[in-house]
């Protein structure tokens, strides 16, 4: 894939583009991640689609914008990118924050032909259960400064609380959080503007979010990918019910063995569902 830049009205976006092998597919990563978050899916995607994997504003090598990290503002960047850089019907696949951005960008937008929502919250208050604590600790680590190695060690010591367990558990103690996984998170987190986390924590990032008005205006087919809420997934059962009520054309797949990370935890089941969904549209 070739890395490039795109100048939106309010921010410069860094992105990676694959060869024109099919339907344009824009990939939108989660908070404190970057375009490489989709690495495990890219070989299959690149062989089938014209892939554009973006760094959202404030992340990776994209530009910083003072007080400019509302999800709606990020979505405006994406809408401009699709209209000016691609210029033809485009599928969006967002994970976590990227999925919220995708929903905003798809609303009332005839240039979006399909939307994949990867374990995104619909109710920002859902962050309070676990992720507010994680993001608050990560925010403090970023403000403290230091090397990627220092940050990786710090991320490993972030404490989380699970229902029914009295003692806090450190991220490095959880299965799957190997040294390599923590180092990769540190690599992307250190390249994230800490203001993205602050605006998430104080909810100013979600100031314009109103699912009751946004979701009904998404006319394209939507695939909801839900992890298991008992395994730290953000998309709750009540949010799924809300989305299915409000979205004109929605499908839903639940992965009982996967948490919020979805494909970063296990690629194949997620890949299979995404390819099935997109194949039916072509």
Enumerate the predicted regions with their spans.
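Alpha/beta-hydrolase fold catalytic core
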Residues: 1-25, 46-49, 86-88, 113, ...
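Conserved HGGG/HGGXW glycine-rich cap/lid loop of the alpha/beta-hydrolase fold
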Residues: 16-64
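Active-site loop/oxyanion-hole signature of alpha/beta-hydrolase fold enzymes
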Residues: 53-97, 264, 272
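Conserved hydrolase catalytic core segment
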Residues: 88-131
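Flexible "cap/lid" loop of the alpha/beta hydrolase fold
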Residues: 115-154
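Conserved alpha/beta-hydrolase catalytic His-Asp/Glu region
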Residues: 126-131, 148-216
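Conserved loop-alpha-helix segment in the C-terminal half of the alpha/beta-hydrolase fold
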Residues: 217-258
């Amino acid at each position: 894939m070739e890395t490039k830049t795109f100048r939106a009205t309010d921010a410069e976006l860094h992105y990676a583009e694959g060869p024109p092998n099919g339907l344009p597919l824009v990939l939108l990563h989660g908070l404190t991640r970057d375009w490489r978050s989709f690495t495990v899916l890219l070989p299959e995607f690149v062989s089938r689609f014209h892939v554009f994997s973006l760094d959202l504003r404030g992340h990776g090598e994209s530009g910083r914008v003072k007080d400019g990290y509302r999800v709606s503002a990020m979505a405006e960047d994406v809408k401009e990118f699709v209209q000016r850089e691609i210029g033809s019907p485009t599928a969006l696949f967002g994970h976590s924050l990227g999925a919220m951005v995708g929903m905003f960008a798809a609303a009332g937008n005839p240039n979006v032909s399909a939307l994949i929502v990867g374990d995104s919250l619909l109710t920002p208050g859902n962050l309070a259960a676990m992720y507010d604590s994680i993001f608050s600790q990560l925010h403090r680590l970023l403000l403290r400064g230091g090397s990627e190695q220092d940050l990786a060690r710090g991320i490993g010591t972030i404490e989380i609380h699970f229902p029914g367990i009295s003692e806090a558990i450190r991220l490095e103690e959880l299965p799957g959080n190997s040294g390599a996984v923590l180092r990769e998170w540190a690599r992307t987190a250190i390249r994230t503007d800490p203001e993205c986390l602050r605006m998430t924590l104080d909810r100013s990032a979600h100031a314009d979010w109103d699912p009751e008005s946004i979701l009904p205006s998404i006319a394209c087919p939507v695939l909801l990918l839900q992890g298991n809420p008992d395994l730290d997934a953000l998309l709750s059962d009540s949010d799924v019910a809300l989305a299915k009520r409000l979205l004109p054309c929605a499908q839903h797949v639940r992965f009982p063995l996967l948490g919020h990370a979805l494909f970063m935890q296990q690629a194949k089941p997620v890949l299979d569902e995404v390819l099935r969904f997109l194949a039916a549209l072509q």
